[in-house]
Curated annotation (Swiss-Prot):
Catalytic residues as annotated in Swiss-Prot or TrEMBL: 338, 362
Subcellular location: Cytoplasm
Record GO biological process: D-arabinose catabolic process; L-fucose catabolic process
UniProt-listed Enzyme Commission number(s): 5.3.1.25
Gene: fucI
Protein's recorded name: L-fucose isomerase
Entry cofactors: Mn(2+)
Length: 591
């Protein structure tokens, strides 16, 4: 089991001894226990373990008890806090003052004791001290002996906890750049100030010659390599596609392709070891290499220097981003193609919020209904009727994105790893063809994964962009994968690279200018790449972004569903403008 941060639960109480405090002790502690149970029963970490909550040893009525609670939370590895109360408490004495913890306060809506009054008072204190907190207040009054958590309160607690756990999990980890800037792509000009100040992360970097050194000096688990090759032969190499993209003089011979398979399998093992380390290497005498870089996310430059000379990174990237490999079902890694760290961060956000594999894609083409009709003679229908966006990547997309995993009703899904079945794994592998890489672009060869995503999956496309003078901003577009007429797909796909994986995406339209039509979504997208997560997670992303002080510049989430710190209300009634002003005022957490 990995070690994850915990969520601290702070039961606060009216400190007046002699009747008041005593009458509230049991009620207040029961609320804290209910919150802890709600979180642990509903939220999991990436390895499937329940998110653990730590409750203060006793209720908090005066500042000494606040300090004792803070000391315990530091000792126990807490990364965020939720304060709960059913009554009046002393605001500045009982509040959480840790500047790095995301924090929320639930004030019980009851008439016997003024929990709502404390909530308002302590939130004013948080705003005044520059320590934004999320206020949680139930819509309906509850009786004093009712310790159940209303549905609206539970939703906010879980939304906060999900995002707060993501913030805490990132803190102290690394982003590993394997290589440097790819083809001048701005997202791969990695900005260490952003990672340090906004995410609390380090930046690690290796030259790609390190991969070759480990290959040539045998610095990898040779037993695992044999196992990996046997698995690859059985499930991937058997699905090697026809080499139709390359001219005869550029096609590699069979023995060269066999060598490429061996090469890319070693690449994957080494890239994983670089990210997270491998105790097996210590047994082999490579103590330094065994450590890894403590990377929660990484990027692989590939183009051009590597791919002009060596097999490309499509196979290792695709499988690292997938929820399984030769060692079985596991948590997906986060690896950004072309070392686009901005997209890698968006993938990391999606992964930490959902525990699912993330799709990395070029946001390649908007196809209008008129253009499709002109090119194919056929019309788009259903969800695709207003046009589609072609999401496609150079063969390095997670195999989970094929949509071959099915839920109980037979619908395509991308599952958390603990819900994946062996049948799901085999279906994803069977649906994936590994085409020899197009050597006009990838001179060194390699193999690109190819599949067509199943339609009907709810997904969220997102992107982090860095803007000079402004800082980071986040874009969010909820929508669906769609299936189109096979003849339409064939003709459109042949106009790009048919050896690469395709996802046809339709955003949910609304009255916001960037979402008035599908074209506007494409036209307002801030970069060439997007990260795509299963599910409509825009609400969670907005909550997470507010914790990190990253304004959201584009989204199609219902404004009534947005949950940000209460202090954001002081920055005006226009939610987007208030978000920008609040993020600018408070600045990054770790600066």
């Amino acid at each position: 089991m990995k070690k994850y941060p915990k969520i601290g639960i702070r039961p606060t109480i009216d400190g007046r001894q002699g009747g008041v405090r005593e009458s509230l002790e049991e009620k207040t502690m029961n609320l804290a226990k209910a919150v802890a149970e709600l979180i642990s029963n509903n939220l999991k970490n990436g390895d499937g373990s329940p998110v653990e909550c730590i409750i203060a040893d006793n209720t908090i009525g005066r500042v000494a008890e606040s300090a004792a609670c803070a000391e315990k939370f530091e000792r126990e590895g807490v990364g965020s806090t939720i304060t709960v109360t059913s009554c009046w408490c002393y605001g500045a004495e009982t509040m959480d003052m840790n500047p790095h913890y995301p924090k929320a306060v639930w004030g019980f809506n009851g008439t016997e004791r003024p929990g709502a009054v404390y909530l308002a008072a302590v939130l004013a204190g948080h705003a005044q001290k520059g320590l934004p907190a999320f206020g949680i207040y139930g819509r309906d009054v509850q009786d004093l002996d009712d310790n159940t958590i209303p549905e609206d309160v539970a939703e906010k607690i879980l939304r906060f906890a999900r995002a707060a756990q993501a913030v805490a999990t990132m803190r102290g980890k690394s982003y590993l750049s394997m290589g440097s800037v790819s083809m001048g792509i701005a997202g791969s000009i990695v900005n260490p100030d952003f990672f340090q100040e906004y995410l609390g992360m380090r930046n690690e970097s290796i030259d790609l010659t390190e991969i070759i050194r480990r290959m040539e000096e045998g610095i990898y688990d040779h037993e695992e390599y044999a196992k990996a090759m046997a698995w690859t032969e059985k499930y991937c190499k058997v699905n090697e596609g026809e080499d139709f993209k390359n001219r005869p003089e550029k096609r590699k011979k069979r023995e060269q392709k066999d060598a490429d398979w061996e090469f890319v399998v070693k690449m994957m093992i080494i890239m994983r070891d670089l990210m997270t380390g491998n105790p097996k290497l210590k047994e082999m005498g490579f103590k330094e290499e065994a450590l890894g870089h403590n990377a929660i996310a990484a990027g692989f430059q590939g183009q051009r220097q590597w791919t002009d000379f060596y097999p490309n990174g499509d196979y290792p990237e695709a499988l690292l981003n997938t929820s399984f490999d030769w060692n079985g079902i596991r948590e997906a890694f986060v690896v950004a193609t072309e070392n686009d760290a901005c997209n890698g961060v968006a993938m990391l956000f999606g992964h930490l919020l959902t525990n699912r594999a993330q799709i990395f894609s070029d946001v390649r083409t908007y196809w209008s209904p008129e253009a499709v009709k002109r090119v194919t003679g056929k019309e788009l229908t259903g969800l695709a009727a207003n046009g589609i966006i072609h999401l496609i990547n150079s063969g390095a997309t997670t195999l989970d994105g094929s949509g071959q995993s099915l839920d109980a009703e037979g619908n395509p899904v991308m599952k958390e790893p603990w819900n994946l079945t062996d049948a799901d794994v085999e279906n994803c592998l069977k649906a994936t063809t590994w085409y020899p890489a197009d050597r006009d672009y990838f001179r060194g060869g390699g193999f690109s994964s190819n599949f067509l995503s199943k339609g009907g999956m709810p997904v969220t496309m997102m992107r982090l962009n860095l803007i000079k003078g402004l800082g980071p901003v986040l874009q969010i577009a909820e929508g669906w994968t769609v299936e189109i007429d096979p003849e339409i797909h064939q003709k459109l796909n042949m106009r790009t690279d048919p050896t690469w994986p395709t996802t046809w995406f339709v955003p949910r339209l609304c009255d916001k200018s960037a979402f008035k039509d599908v074209y506007s979504v494409m036209n307002n997208w801030g970069a060439n790449h997007g990260a795509i997560s299963y599910g409509h997670i825009g609400q969670d992303l907005i909550t997470l972004a507010s914790m990190l002080r990253i304004p959201v510049c584009m989204h199609n989430v219902d404004e009534n569903e947005i949950f940000r710190p209460t202090a954001w209300n002081a920055f005006g009634m226009d939610k987007e403008g208030a978000d920008y002003r609040a993020c600018t005022t408070y600045g990054p957490i770790y600066k």
